[in-house]
Amino acid sequence: MDPEVSLLLQCPPGGLPEKQVRAELSPAYDRRPLPGGDKAIIAIWESRLQAQPWLFNAPKFRLHSATLAPTGLPGPQLLLRLGLTSYQDFLGTNWASSAAWLRQQGATDWGDKQAYLADPLGVGAALATADDFLVFLRRSGQVAEAPGLVDVPGGHPEPQALCPGDSPLHKDLPGELVVHELFSSVLQEICDEVNVPPLTLSQPLLLGIACNETSAGRASAEFYVQCSLTSEQVRRHYMSGGPEAHESTGIIFVEKQSMQRLQETEMWPELCPSAKGAIFLYNRVQGSST
């Protein structure tokens, strides 16, 4: 494995389509208030805003836990238990200098080292071209997280896509629509970052959930998506610029058959943790079935 990443959940071989996943939203799955209150989170946010006035807060889904049903049973195979959190809470917990202490305290107080952490759920894609390459992006030096490192296309599912406003309520977010947002958000991120047309992309298959240990175990759902374009066609679309072109400075293609040994190459240390998680899951869930 790699100390920067851990695997929370691995889906069955080939991955899970949207209809095999369900979500349950509840305030019980939210972050616990910090010991001594949340004043520290607000103080961190205000100091970050002074340094980076372009930052904006937004609601996010919080992953509390995920459970796979025993194989062979009818109905959805994966249950996601989700709460709500925010970007502000992420910076004030997962990214705070006190994150390691918060994990220790959560384990002591609640038997859950993530209890006090925002843990906003991200999405990422192992995106394959028609000529059997996987797509990576070199992150811009301007992005807040992992500047200059190599990543897979990805981002976050957005509660505001289902319920406009800054303070969505759990009861206004039906599980079925949340699962659809999770799966459609990864396609939207690919279109925005790589600039390929939506109709060139297959329906995503969920590979599993990986945790970024450099941001206190923050989780990302990693997917496999097939593109009907060749690597050269994808490169041309990327070079013509998309809505989030500013987030990356270059596109990199690596042969699918190299994935099992990517950890032994000089590219591996350049990968950010979320990309490492996507590759580990791709190799275990999809790589063996292609």
Curated annotation (Swiss-Prot):
Cofactor(s) required for function per UniProt: Mg(2+)
Protein name (record): Uridine diphosphate glucose pyrophosphatase NUDT22
Keyword set includes Heme: no
Annotated PANTHER family: URIDINE DIPHOSPHATE GLUCOSE PYROPHOSPHATASE, URIDINE DIPHOSPHATE GLUCOSE PYROPHOSPHATASE NUDT22
Role according to the record: Hydrolyzes UDP-glucose to glucose 1-phosphate and UMP and UDP-galactose to galactose 1-phosphate and UMP. Preferred substrate is UDP-glucose.
Gene: NUDT22
Alphabetical UniProt keywords: Hydrolase, Magnesium, Metal-binding
Segments forming domain Nudix hydrolase: 118-285
Source species, domain of life: Eukaryota
Annotated catalysed reactions: UDP-sugar + H2O = UMP + alpha-D-aldose 1-phosphate
Motif (Nudix box): 175-196
